[in-house]
Curated annotation (Swiss-Prot):
Example GO BP: phenylpropanoid metabolic process
Region: Disordered, residue numbers: 182-205
Sorted UniProt keywords: ATP-binding, Ligase, Magnesium, Nucleotide-binding
Source organism, top-level taxon: Eukaryota
Amino-acid positions noted as binding (E)-4-coumaroyl-AMP in the UniProt annotation, renumbered to this chain: Y256, G324, Q346, G347, T351, K449, K453
Record's protein name: 4-coumarate--CoA ligase-like 4
Catalyzed reaction equations: (E)-4-coumarate + ATP + CoA = (E)-4-coumaroyl-CoA + AMP + diphosphate; (E)-4-coumarate + ATP + H(+) = (E)-4-coumaroyl-AMP + diphosphate; (E)-4-coumaroyl-AMP + CoA = (E)-4-coumaroyl-CoA + AMP + H(+)
GO molecular function: 4-coumarate-CoA ligase activity; ATP binding; CoA-ligase activity; trans-cinnamate-CoA ligase activity
Amino acid sequence: MGRSPEMEVDARSGYCAATRTFRSRRADVPLPADPEVDVVSFLASRRHSGVVALVDAATGRRITFTELWRAVAGAASALAAHPVSLRKGHVALILSPNSVHFPVAALAAMSLGAVLTTANPLNTPAEIAKQVADARPVLAFTTRELLPKLPRAHDLRVVLLESARLPGDSSDPRIVATIEEISATTPDPARRKDRVTQDDPATLLYSSGTTGPSKGVVATHRSLISMVQIIMTRFRLEGSDKTETFLCTVPMFHVYGLVAFATGLLGCGATVVVLSKYELPEMLRSINAYGVTYLPLVPPILVAMVAHPKPLPLGQMRKVLSGGAPLGKELIEGFREKYPQVEILQGYGLTESTAIGASTDSAEESRRYGTAGLLSPNTEAKIVDPDSGEALPVNRTGELWIRGPYVMKGYFKNAEATQSTLTPDGWLKTGDLCYIDEDGYLFVVDRLKELIKYKGYQVPPAELEALLLTHPEVTDVAVIPFPDREVGQFPMAYIVRKKGSNLSEREVMEFVAKQVAPYKKVRKVAFVTDIPKNASGKILRKDLIKLATSKL
Protein backbone atom coordinates (compact mmCIF):
# COMPACT_ATOMS: atom_id res chain seq x y z
CA MET A 1 0.00 0.00 0.00
CA GLY A 2 1.50 3.39 -1.03
CA ARG A 3 2.14 6.21 1.42
CA SER A 4 -0.46 8.95 1.47
CA PRO A 5 0.59 12.54 0.74
CA GLU A 6 -0.21 13.30 4.39
CA MET A 7 2.64 10.99 5.46
CA GLU A 8 5.10 12.64 3.09
CA VAL A 9 4.98 16.12 4.62
CA ASP A 10 8.45 17.16 5.74
CA ALA A 11 8.12 18.02 9.43
CA ARG A 12 10.80 20.70 9.23
CA SER A 13 9.66 22.71 6.18
CA GLY A 14 6.04 21.60 5.85
CA TYR A 15 6.71 20.70 2.20
CA CYS A 16 4.84 17.79 0.66
CA ALA A 17 6.69 16.51 -2.42
CA ALA A 18 3.68 14.50 -3.60
CA THR A 19 1.37 17.53 -3.84
CA ARG A 20 4.15 20.16 -4.24
CA THR A 21 2.52 22.22 -1.52
CA PHE A 22 3.62 23.59 1.83
CA ARG A 23 1.50 23.10 4.93
CA SER A 24 1.61 25.28 8.01
CA ARG A 25 3.79 23.98 10.80
CA ARG A 26 1.32 25.50 13.25
CA ALA A 27 -1.56 23.42 14.58
CA ASP A 28 -4.92 24.03 12.91
CA VAL A 29 -7.41 26.12 14.87
CA PRO A 30 -10.93 24.73 15.40
CA LEU A 31 -13.71 26.28 13.31
CA PRO A 32 -17.45 25.97 13.99
CA ALA A 33 -19.13 23.08 12.19
CA ASP A 34 -22.54 24.78 12.20
CA PRO A 35 -22.91 26.59 8.83
CA GLU A 36 -25.45 29.03 10.32
CA VAL A 37 -23.05 31.02 12.48
CA ASP A 38 -22.27 34.66 11.81
CA VAL A 39 -19.11 36.34 13.09
CA VAL A 40 -20.98 38.54 15.58
CA SER A 41 -22.77 35.61 17.23
CA PHE A 42 -19.47 33.74 17.27
CA LEU A 43 -17.67 36.64 19.00
CA ALA A 44 -20.45 37.17 21.54
CA SER A 45 -20.46 33.47 22.45
CA ARG A 46 -16.77 33.34 23.40
CA ARG A 47 -16.15 32.83 27.13
CA HIS A 48 -13.46 34.92 28.79
CA SER A 49 -12.66 36.79 32.00
CA GLY A 50 -12.34 40.23 30.40
CA VAL A 51 -14.35 43.15 31.80
CA VAL A 52 -13.50 46.29 29.80
CA ALA A 53 -13.81 45.94 26.03
CA LEU A 54 -13.05 49.43 24.74
CA VAL A 55 -11.42 52.58 26.11
CA ASP A 56 -11.48 56.01 24.45
CA ALA A 57 -7.85 57.09 24.80
CA ALA A 58 -8.69 60.81 24.69
CA THR A 59 -11.51 60.88 27.27
CA GLY A 60 -10.89 57.75 29.32
CA ARG A 61 -14.44 56.52 28.69
CA ARG A 62 -14.69 52.77 29.26
CA ILE A 63 -17.17 50.38 27.64
CA THR A 64 -17.53 46.99 29.32
CA PHE A 65 -18.24 43.81 27.38
CA THR A 66 -21.76 43.76 28.84
CA GLU A 67 -22.34 47.32 27.61
CA LEU A 68 -20.78 46.54 24.22
CA TRP A 69 -23.03 43.58 23.43
CA ARG A 70 -26.09 45.42 24.76
CA ALA A 71 -25.24 48.36 22.47
CA VAL A 72 -24.72 46.06 19.46
CA ALA A 73 -28.08 44.34 20.04
CA GLY A 74 -29.86 47.66 20.52
CA ALA A 75 -28.27 49.23 17.45
CA ALA A 76 -29.13 46.17 15.34
CA SER A 77 -32.79 46.37 16.41
CA ALA A 78 -32.93 50.07 15.56
CA LEU A 79 -31.23 49.60 12.18
CA ALA A 80 -33.59 46.77 11.23
CA ALA A 81 -36.60 49.02 11.87
CA HIS A 82 -37.95 51.94 9.83
CA PRO A 83 -36.58 54.25 8.46
CA VAL A 84 -33.29 52.39 7.79
CA SER A 85 -34.74 48.86 7.45
CA LEU A 86 -31.26 47.35 7.09
CA ARG A 87 -31.44 43.79 5.77
CA LYS A 88 -29.21 40.90 4.78
CA GLY A 89 -27.28 41.74 1.61
CA HIS A 90 -27.56 45.51 2.05
CA VAL A 91 -24.26 47.42 2.18
CA ALA A 92 -23.43 49.69 5.13
CA LEU A 93 -20.54 52.17 4.88
CA ILE A 94 -18.38 53.43 7.74
CA LEU A 95 -16.55 56.69 7.00
CA SER A 96 -14.87 57.57 10.26
CA PRO A 97 -11.60 57.89 12.11
CA ASN A 98 -10.99 55.36 14.87
CA SER A 99 -13.48 55.59 17.72
CA VAL A 100 -15.15 53.38 20.32
CA HIS A 101 -18.31 53.74 18.18
CA PHE A 102 -16.68 52.05 15.17
CA PRO A 103 -16.90 48.44 16.47
CA VAL A 104 -20.51 48.95 17.63
CA ALA A 105 -21.54 50.14 14.16
CA ALA A 106 -19.59 47.38 12.40
CA LEU A 107 -20.89 44.55 14.59
CA ALA A 108 -24.50 45.78 14.55
CA ALA A 109 -24.54 45.94 10.74
CA MET A 110 -22.88 42.53 10.26
CA SER A 111 -25.19 40.89 12.82
CA LEU A 112 -28.10 41.70 10.48
CA GLY A 113 -26.34 40.09 7.52
CA ALA A 114 -25.48 43.48 6.02
CA VAL A 115 -22.14 43.79 4.22
CA LEU A 116 -19.72 46.26 5.78
CA THR A 117 -17.62 48.57 3.63
CA THR A 118 -15.20 51.19 4.94
CA ALA A 119 -13.58 54.31 3.49
CA ASN A 120 -10.47 56.25 4.42
CA PRO A 121 -11.47 59.60 6.02
CA LEU A 122 -8.57 61.23 4.17
CA ASN A 123 -10.10 60.33 0.79
CA THR A 124 -11.46 63.16 -1.31
CA PRO A 125 -15.21 63.56 -1.88
CA ALA A 126 -14.67 62.35 -5.46
CA GLU A 127 -12.90 59.17 -4.27
CA ILE A 128 -15.63 58.49 -1.72
CA ALA A 129 -18.34 59.12 -4.32
CA LYS A 130 -16.67 56.57 -6.60
CA GLN A 131 -16.73 53.94 -3.85
CA VAL A 132 -20.35 54.76 -2.96
CA ALA A 133 -21.33 54.42 -6.62
CA ASP A 134 -19.63 51.01 -6.77
CA ALA A 135 -20.75 49.56 -3.42
CA ARG A 136 -24.20 51.27 -3.34
CA PRO A 137 -24.61 51.43 0.46
CA VAL A 138 -28.08 52.11 1.88
CA LEU A 139 -26.61 53.36 5.15
CA ALA A 140 -23.55 55.37 6.14
CA PHE A 141 -22.04 55.74 9.60
CA THR A 142 -19.97 58.91 9.73
CA THR A 143 -19.05 61.91 11.85
CA ARG A 144 -20.41 65.43 11.62
CA GLU A 145 -17.02 66.63 10.35
CA LEU A 146 -16.89 64.06 7.54
CA LEU A 147 -20.55 64.28 6.50
CA PRO A 148 -19.84 66.87 3.74
CA LYS A 149 -17.60 64.29 2.01
CA LEU A 150 -20.54 61.95 1.42
CA PRO A 151 -22.42 62.31 -1.88
CA ARG A 152 -25.91 63.73 -1.36
CA ALA A 153 -27.74 60.62 -2.56
CA HIS A 154 -31.38 60.89 -1.55
CA ASP A 155 -31.60 57.21 -0.62
CA LEU A 156 -28.50 57.11 1.63
CA ARG A 157 -29.44 57.16 5.31
CA VAL A 158 -26.87 58.46 7.81
CA VAL A 159 -26.19 57.52 11.43
CA LEU A 160 -23.82 59.99 13.07
CA LEU A 161 -21.03 58.45 15.13
CA GLU A 162 -21.58 61.12 17.76
CA SER A 163 -22.82 61.13 21.35
CA ALA A 164 -25.68 63.57 20.81
CA ARG A 165 -27.54 65.51 18.14
CA LEU A 166 -27.00 69.20 17.55
CA PRO A 167 -29.75 71.61 16.41
CA GLY A 168 -28.19 71.92 12.95
CA ASP A 169 -28.49 68.16 12.30
CA SER A 170 -32.21 68.46 11.57
CA SER A 171 -31.45 70.45 8.41
CA ASP A 172 -29.93 67.36 6.75
CA PRO A 173 -32.71 64.92 5.84
CA ARG A 174 -30.21 62.06 5.47
CA ILE A 175 -29.49 61.96 9.22
CA VAL A 176 -31.76 59.46 10.96
CA ALA A 177 -30.02 59.05 14.35
CA THR A 178 -26.79 59.10 16.32
CA ILE A 179 -24.97 55.92 17.32
CA GLU A 180 -25.74 56.63 20.99
CA GLU A 181 -29.47 56.85 20.21
CA ILE A 182 -29.64 53.55 18.36
CA SER A 183 -27.34 51.81 20.86
CA ALA A 184 -29.77 52.70 23.66
CA THR A 185 -32.68 51.02 21.84
CA THR A 186 -34.28 48.14 23.71
CA PRO A 187 -33.75 45.03 21.55
CA ASP A 188 -36.98 43.67 20.08
CA PRO A 189 -37.23 39.97 21.02
CA ALA A 190 -39.97 39.48 18.42
CA ARG A 191 -37.83 40.83 15.57
CA ARG A 192 -37.49 38.31 12.76
CA LYS A 193 -33.82 37.78 11.92
CA ASP A 194 -32.57 36.98 8.45
CA ARG A 195 -30.71 33.67 8.23
CA VAL A 196 -26.98 34.45 8.05
CA THR A 197 -24.49 31.68 7.22
CA GLN A 198 -20.72 31.38 7.28
CA ASP A 199 -20.69 31.57 3.48
CA ASP A 200 -22.52 34.91 3.35
CA PRO A 201 -20.56 38.11 2.60
CA ALA A 202 -19.55 40.06 5.73
CA THR A 203 -17.20 42.78 4.47
CA LEU A 204 -16.48 44.64 1.25
CA LEU A 205 -13.08 46.26 1.72
CA TYR A 206 -11.34 48.12 -1.06
CA SER A 207 -7.75 47.02 -1.65
CA SER A 208 -5.07 49.69 -1.46
CA GLY A 209 -4.42 49.69 -5.19
CA THR A 210 -0.67 50.20 -4.81
CA THR A 211 -0.12 48.97 -8.38
CA GLY A 212 -3.45 49.79 -10.03
CA PRO A 213 -7.10 50.70 -9.47
CA SER A 214 -8.61 49.76 -6.11
CA LYS A 215 -10.91 46.69 -6.12
CA GLY A 216 -13.66 45.67 -3.72
CA VAL A 217 -12.70 42.51 -1.81
CA VAL A 218 -15.60 40.39 -0.51
CA ALA A 219 -14.87 38.38 2.65
CA THR A 220 -17.35 36.01 4.27
CA HIS A 221 -18.36 35.40 7.87
CA ARG A 222 -16.21 32.25 7.67
CA SER A 223 -13.21 34.42 6.70
CA LEU A 224 -13.69 36.59 9.78
CA ILE A 225 -14.39 33.68 12.14
CA SER A 226 -11.16 32.02 10.94
CA MET A 227 -9.30 35.25 11.60
CA VAL A 228 -10.76 35.52 15.13
CA GLN A 229 -9.58 32.01 15.97
CA ILE A 230 -6.12 32.60 14.49
CA ILE A 231 -5.70 35.88 16.42
CA MET A 232 -6.70 34.26 19.72
CA THR A 233 -4.30 31.38 19.12
CA ARG A 234 -1.45 33.64 18.02
CA PHE A 235 -1.57 35.74 21.17
CA ARG A 236 -2.57 32.79 23.39
CA LEU A 237 -5.51 34.84 24.63
CA GLU A 238 -8.24 32.22 24.91
CA GLY A 239 -8.56 30.63 28.34
CA SER A 240 -6.07 33.08 29.89
CA ASP A 241 -6.93 34.74 33.22
CA LYS A 242 -4.69 37.70 32.39
CA THR A 243 -6.33 40.54 30.48
CA GLU A 244 -4.07 42.01 27.81
CA THR A 245 -4.44 45.64 26.76
CA PHE A 246 -3.96 46.52 23.08
CA LEU A 247 -3.50 50.07 21.78
CA CYS A 248 -5.25 50.66 18.47
CA THR A 249 -2.95 52.92 16.44
CA VAL A 250 -3.82 51.47 13.04
CA PRO A 251 -6.95 52.60 11.16
CA MET A 252 -10.05 50.47 11.65
CA PHE A 253 -11.10 51.17 8.05
CA HIS A 254 -8.10 49.08 6.95
CA VAL A 255 -8.30 45.27 7.00
CA TYR A 256 -5.58 45.05 9.67
CA GLY A 257 -7.42 47.38 12.06
CA LEU A 258 -10.90 46.11 11.27
CA VAL A 259 -10.23 42.42 11.78
CA ALA A 260 -8.15 42.94 14.93
CA PHE A 261 -9.79 45.79 16.82
CA ALA A 262 -13.38 45.95 15.60
CA THR A 263 -13.85 42.17 15.63
CA GLY A 264 -11.11 39.69 16.58
CA LEU A 265 -9.85 40.94 19.94
CA LEU A 266 -13.42 41.47 21.19
CA GLY A 267 -13.87 37.70 21.26
CA CYS A 268 -11.12 36.99 23.76
CA GLY A 269 -11.60 39.46 26.58
CA ALA A 270 -8.74 41.79 25.64
CA THR A 271 -9.13 45.52 26.26
CA VAL A 272 -8.73 47.76 23.21
CA VAL A 273 -7.62 51.35 23.84
CA VAL A 274 -8.67 53.42 20.82
CA LEU A 275 -6.61 56.32 19.46
CA SER A 276 -8.63 58.49 17.09
CA LYS A 277 -5.45 59.16 15.12
CA TYR A 278 -1.78 58.39 15.53
CA GLU A 279 0.39 61.05 17.15
CA LEU A 280 3.55 59.95 18.95
CA PRO A 281 3.03 61.99 22.17
CA GLU A 282 -0.59 60.81 22.52
CA MET A 283 0.44 57.22 21.80
CA LEU A 284 3.05 57.34 24.58
CA ARG A 285 0.61 58.96 27.03
CA SER A 286 -1.96 56.24 26.33
CA ILE A 287 0.58 53.42 26.67
CA ASN A 288 1.46 54.59 30.16
CA ALA A 289 -1.98 55.80 31.29
CA TYR A 290 -3.80 52.57 30.41
CA GLY A 291 -1.11 49.95 31.04
CA VAL A 292 -0.88 48.89 27.39
CA THR A 293 0.87 45.52 26.93
CA TYR A 294 0.51 45.01 23.14
CA LEU A 295 1.15 47.64 20.46
CA PRO A 296 0.07 46.69 16.93
CA LEU A 297 1.42 49.22 14.45
CA VAL A 298 2.64 49.85 10.93
CA PRO A 299 6.34 50.25 10.03
CA PRO A 300 6.43 54.09 9.87
CA ILE A 301 5.56 54.23 13.61
CA LEU A 302 8.32 51.74 14.36
CA VAL A 303 10.76 53.87 12.36
CA ALA A 304 9.79 56.93 14.44
CA MET A 305 10.33 55.01 17.70
CA VAL A 306 13.80 53.86 16.62
CA ALA A 307 14.77 57.28 15.26
CA HIS A 308 13.95 59.04 18.55
CA PRO A 309 17.17 60.27 20.23
CA LYS A 310 16.37 58.48 23.51
CA PRO A 311 14.36 55.34 24.32
CA LEU A 312 10.70 56.24 24.72
CA PRO A 313 8.88 55.32 27.97
CA LEU A 314 6.86 52.20 27.14
CA GLY A 315 5.56 51.29 30.61
CA GLN A 316 4.25 47.70 30.75
CA MET A 317 4.63 47.12 27.01
CA ARG A 318 5.67 43.55 26.21
CA LYS A 319 5.06 43.12 22.49
CA VAL A 320 5.05 45.24 19.35
CA LEU A 321 3.22 43.75 16.37
CA SER A 322 4.17 45.09 12.95
CA GLY A 323 2.16 44.49 9.80
CA GLY A 324 1.60 46.05 6.40
CA ALA A 325 5.16 45.99 5.04
CA PRO A 326 8.30 43.94 5.80
CA LEU A 327 10.87 45.18 8.34
CA GLY A 328 14.55 45.36 7.47
CA LYS A 329 17.33 43.87 9.59
CA GLU A 330 18.66 47.31 10.59
CA LEU A 331 15.24 48.42 11.84
CA ILE A 332 14.67 45.24 13.87
CA GLU A 333 18.16 45.42 15.39
CA GLY A 334 17.76 49.13 16.11
CA PHE A 335 14.47 48.51 17.91
CA ARG A 336 15.89 45.61 19.96
CA GLU A 337 18.86 47.70 21.02
CA LYS A 338 16.68 50.63 22.11
CA TYR A 339 13.83 48.59 23.66
CA PRO A 340 15.32 45.27 24.84
CA GLN A 341 12.35 44.53 27.10
CA VAL A 342 9.87 44.49 24.18
CA GLU A 343 9.43 41.61 21.71
CA ILE A 344 8.92 42.58 18.08
CA LEU A 345 6.63 40.35 16.03
CA GLN A 346 5.68 40.58 12.35
CA GLY A 347 2.78 39.52 10.20
CA TYR A 348 2.06 39.09 6.50
CA GLY A 349 -1.35 39.25 4.90
CA LEU A 350 -3.47 40.89 2.22
CA THR A 351 -6.93 42.36 2.08
CA GLU A 352 -7.74 39.30 -0.07
CA SER A 353 -6.64 36.97 2.77
CA THR A 354 -8.44 38.91 5.53
CA ALA A 355 -5.02 40.09 6.79
CA ILE A 356 -3.82 36.51 7.34
CA GLY A 357 -1.00 34.53 5.73
CA ALA A 358 2.10 34.23 7.90
CA SER A 359 3.51 35.59 11.14
CA THR A 360 6.30 35.43 13.66
CA ASP A 361 4.77 34.61 17.03
CA SER A 362 7.84 34.81 19.28
CA ALA A 363 11.07 36.77 19.57
CA GLU A 364 12.95 33.65 18.50
CA GLU A 365 10.96 33.40 15.25
CA SER A 366 11.53 37.12 14.56
CA ARG A 367 15.30 36.65 14.81
CA ARG A 368 15.22 35.03 11.39
CA TYR A 369 15.79 38.40 9.71
CA GLY A 370 13.72 39.24 6.68
CA THR A 371 11.09 36.58 7.27
CA ALA A 372 7.35 37.19 7.31
CA GLY A 373 7.13 34.16 9.61
CA LEU A 374 5.61 30.70 9.52
CA LEU A 375 2.42 30.09 7.57
CA SER A 376 -0.72 30.82 9.61
CA PRO A 377 -2.78 27.92 11.01
CA ASN A 378 -5.16 26.19 8.56
CA THR A 379 -2.98 27.37 5.66
CA GLU A 380 -1.55 25.66 2.59
CA ALA A 381 0.87 27.38 0.25
CA LYS A 382 2.43 26.89 -3.16
CA ILE A 383 5.40 28.68 -4.67
CA VAL A 384 4.66 28.86 -8.40
CA ASP A 385 7.05 29.75 -11.22
CA PRO A 386 5.37 32.77 -12.90
CA ASP A 387 6.54 31.69 -16.35
CA SER A 388 6.06 27.91 -16.39
CA GLY A 389 3.30 27.57 -13.78
CA GLU A 390 5.35 24.84 -12.10
CA ALA A 391 5.04 24.47 -8.30
CA LEU A 392 8.50 24.87 -6.75
CA PRO A 393 10.16 23.23 -3.72
CA VAL A 394 12.02 24.69 -0.72
CA ASN A 395 14.23 27.78 -1.22
CA ARG A 396 12.99 28.47 -4.77
CA THR A 397 11.48 31.86 -5.57
CA GLY A 398 8.11 32.19 -7.30
CA GLU A 399 4.63 33.62 -6.81
CA LEU A 400 3.05 32.73 -3.48
CA TRP A 401 -0.35 31.02 -3.69
CA ILE A 402 -2.22 30.39 -0.44
CA ARG A 403 -5.35 28.49 0.47
CA GLY A 404 -7.31 28.62 3.71
CA PRO A 405 -10.76 29.34 5.18
CA TYR A 406 -10.00 33.07 5.39
CA VAL A 407 -9.44 33.63 1.65
CA MET A 408 -11.83 36.10 0.02
CA LYS A 409 -14.98 35.09 -1.82
CA GLY A 410 -13.91 37.23 -4.78
CA TYR A 411 -13.75 40.76 -6.14
CA PHE A 412 -17.00 42.72 -6.10
CA LYS A 413 -18.62 42.95 -9.55
CA ASN A 414 -15.31 41.99 -11.19
CA ALA A 415 -15.45 38.41 -12.48
CA GLU A 416 -12.36 38.87 -14.65
CA ALA A 417 -10.17 39.96 -11.73
CA THR A 418 -11.60 37.17 -9.56
CA GLN A 419 -10.83 34.51 -12.17
CA SER A 420 -7.27 35.75 -12.60
CA THR A 421 -6.64 35.81 -8.83
CA LEU A 422 -8.62 32.82 -7.46
CA THR A 423 -8.29 29.32 -8.92
CA PRO A 424 -11.36 27.05 -9.10
CA ASP A 425 -9.94 24.92 -6.27
CA GLY A 426 -9.51 27.88 -3.91
CA TRP A 427 -5.91 29.04 -4.33
CA LEU A 428 -5.33 32.78 -3.92
CA LYS A 429 -2.58 34.11 -6.20
CA THR A 430 -1.02 36.77 -3.99
CA GLY A 431 1.07 38.56 -6.61
CA ASP A 432 4.02 38.40 -4.20
CA LEU A 433 7.36 36.86 -5.16
CA CYS A 434 8.36 34.65 -2.23
CA TYR A 435 10.24 31.59 -1.13
CA ILE A 436 9.83 29.25 1.84
CA ASP A 437 13.03 28.02 3.48
CA GLU A 438 13.96 24.61 4.85
CA ASP A 439 12.38 25.46 8.23
CA GLY A 440 9.06 26.59 6.77
CA TYR A 441 9.66 30.34 7.06
CA LEU A 442 8.17 32.58 4.38
CA PHE A 443 10.30 35.32 2.80
CA VAL A 444 8.68 38.01 0.63
CA VAL A 445 11.06 39.13 -2.11
CA ASP A 446 8.87 41.65 -3.95
CA ARG A 447 5.56 42.28 -5.65
CA LEU A 448 5.39 40.31 -8.90
CA LYS A 449 3.73 43.22 -10.71
CA GLU A 450 6.32 45.69 -9.40
CA LEU A 451 9.36 43.94 -10.85
CA ILE A 452 11.39 46.23 -13.07
CA LYS A 453 12.02 44.64 -16.47
CA TYR A 454 15.48 45.80 -17.58
CA LYS A 455 16.22 44.21 -20.97
CA GLY A 456 15.57 40.54 -20.18
CA TYR A 457 16.35 40.89 -16.48
CA GLN A 458 13.95 41.27 -13.56
CA VAL A 459 14.94 43.75 -10.84
CA PRO A 460 13.07 43.72 -7.49
CA PRO A 461 12.59 47.32 -6.25
CA ALA A 462 12.55 46.16 -2.61
CA GLU A 463 16.12 44.87 -2.94
CA LEU A 464 17.39 48.26 -4.10
CA GLU A 465 15.32 50.05 -1.45
CA ALA A 466 16.83 47.91 1.31
CA LEU A 467 20.31 48.69 -0.02
CA LEU A 468 19.69 52.44 -0.27
CA LEU A 469 18.34 52.55 3.29
CA THR A 470 21.79 51.49 4.49
CA HIS A 471 23.22 54.80 3.20
CA PRO A 472 23.82 57.06 6.23
CA GLU A 473 22.24 60.09 4.53
CA VAL A 474 19.02 58.36 3.37
CA THR A 475 15.93 58.29 5.63
CA ASP A 476 13.40 56.86 3.18
CA VAL A 477 13.33 55.61 -0.40
CA ALA A 478 11.14 54.18 -3.13
CA VAL A 479 12.34 52.59 -6.36
CA ILE A 480 10.14 52.49 -9.45
CA PRO A 481 10.40 51.33 -13.07
CA PHE A 482 11.17 54.22 -15.43
CA PRO A 483 10.23 53.59 -19.09
CA ASP A 484 13.03 53.55 -21.63
CA ARG A 485 12.83 52.81 -25.37
CA GLU A 486 16.10 50.87 -25.51
CA VAL A 487 16.01 48.73 -22.35
CA GLY A 488 12.27 48.67 -21.56
CA GLN A 489 12.56 49.94 -17.99
CA PHE A 490 15.33 50.91 -15.60
CA PRO A 491 15.37 51.56 -11.84
CA MET A 492 14.64 55.11 -10.68
CA ALA A 493 14.98 56.05 -7.01
CA TYR A 494 12.99 58.62 -5.06
CA ILE A 495 15.09 59.60 -2.04
CA VAL A 496 14.30 61.41 1.22
CA ARG A 497 17.59 62.83 2.47
CA LYS A 498 18.49 63.30 6.12
CA LYS A 499 18.18 66.87 7.36
CA GLY A 500 21.17 68.93 6.26
CA SER A 501 22.35 66.35 3.71
CA ASN A 502 23.61 67.44 0.28
CA LEU A 503 23.62 63.93 -1.14
CA SER A 504 23.67 64.13 -4.96
CA GLU A 505 22.19 62.00 -7.72
CA ARG A 506 25.66 60.92 -8.82
CA GLU A 507 26.60 59.82 -5.27
CA VAL A 508 23.42 57.76 -4.98
CA MET A 509 24.01 56.03 -8.30
CA GLU A 510 27.65 55.29 -7.45
CA PHE A 511 26.68 53.91 -4.03
CA VAL A 512 24.34 51.39 -5.65
CA ALA A 513 26.57 50.60 -8.65
CA LYS A 514 29.40 49.41 -6.38
CA GLN A 515 27.15 46.81 -4.76
CA VAL A 516 24.89 45.35 -7.47
CA ALA A 517 25.01 43.66 -10.87
CA PRO A 518 25.07 46.12 -13.81
CA TYR A 519 21.42 45.51 -14.76
CA LYS A 520 20.30 46.52 -11.24
CA LYS A 521 21.97 49.94 -11.29
CA VAL A 522 19.86 52.97 -10.37
CA ARG A 523 19.98 55.21 -13.45
CA LYS A 524 17.81 58.13 -12.32
CA VAL A 525 17.29 59.82 -8.92
CA ALA A 526 14.82 62.39 -7.60
CA PHE A 527 14.87 63.92 -4.12
CA VAL A 528 11.55 64.39 -2.31
CA THR A 529 10.38 65.41 1.17
CA ASP A 530 8.38 62.22 1.73
CA ILE A 531 7.42 58.93 0.09
CA PRO A 532 3.67 58.44 -0.54
CA LYS A 533 2.36 55.41 1.35
CA ASN A 534 -1.01 53.90 2.11
CA ALA A 535 -2.49 53.42 5.58
CA SER A 536 -0.56 50.19 6.15
CA GLY A 537 2.81 51.66 5.18
CA LYS A 538 3.05 50.23 1.66
CA ILE A 539 4.68 52.47 -0.94
CA LEU A 540 2.22 53.90 -3.48
CA ARG A 541 4.43 53.23 -6.49
CA LYS A 542 1.66 54.00 -8.95
CA ASP A 543 1.65 57.62 -7.68
CA LEU A 544 5.41 57.91 -8.11
CA ILE A 545 5.30 56.29 -11.55
CA LYS A 546 2.63 58.80 -12.57
CA LEU A 547 4.77 61.66 -11.22
CA ALA A 548 7.89 60.44 -13.01
CA THR A 549 6.22 59.80 -16.36
CA SER A 550 4.13 62.99 -16.36
CA LYS A 551 7.25 64.91 -17.38
CA LEU A 552 8.00 62.75 -20.42
